[in-house]
Amino acid sequence: MAKGIRERLLEQAIKFHQWQEAAYPGKTSEELGGEWEVDYPYWNDTYSAFCHVLTQTDAETADSVLLDEMVYLIARDNEAEGFIQETTSHPQWFERLCRRAAASNESEAKWQFAAYLPECPCRQEVKDMILDFAKDPNEYVSRRALLAMPALYFLADMVKLLERLCHVPADKILCILRRAKFTK
């Protein structure tokens, strides 16, 4: 990976961390909640550096530091969703970052990956990660995954998946889906 491209994005991530600490001393992202990230004045520079990594580097060469910071930035951009939208156009990056997000504590990144899985032309094994997101302890992550399932699976497949996931008989699942207007 070109060192300058990686370093530019990492510098932007550090800048964001520094801004967060200065603006909200001692508060974690989870403690802040809400839409606090929208006040960050350098989103355009950060977005540009992020896109440069996606377009100019190979996802397989990314190290854990870069992947963690990219997941962090996707999570912080949860109001605009620009980072995740751009990532869907780069399937190799989407796959690596989706796996990294699933293993992280970044619920704001997890729900975005769950929601955008249907839009990414990634491999089926990655699309099947929707089940991991559906079982996530964070209710919003789980709900967004369940909402994305119909776009990923045919109804019969979805019923089987929900049967396994929820331990509920198929007839009850179909009843719930009918009420939710997923099927007639």
Q: Which residues make up each language-model segment?
A:
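Accessory, usually C-terminal, subdomains that scaffold auxiliary metal cofactors
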Residues: 165-173
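Extended amphipathic alpha-helical repeat scaffolds
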Residues: 1-47
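Residue-level signal for secondary-structure boundary elements
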Residues: 21-28, 62, 82, 173
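Structural detector for internal amphipathic alpha-helices that build alpha-solenoid repeat scaffolds
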Residues: 33-56, 68-89, 108-122, 140-155, ...
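Amphipathic alpha-helical scaffolding segments comprising HEAT/armadillo-like alpha-solenoid repeats
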Residues: 57-68, 90-103, 122-135, 154-166
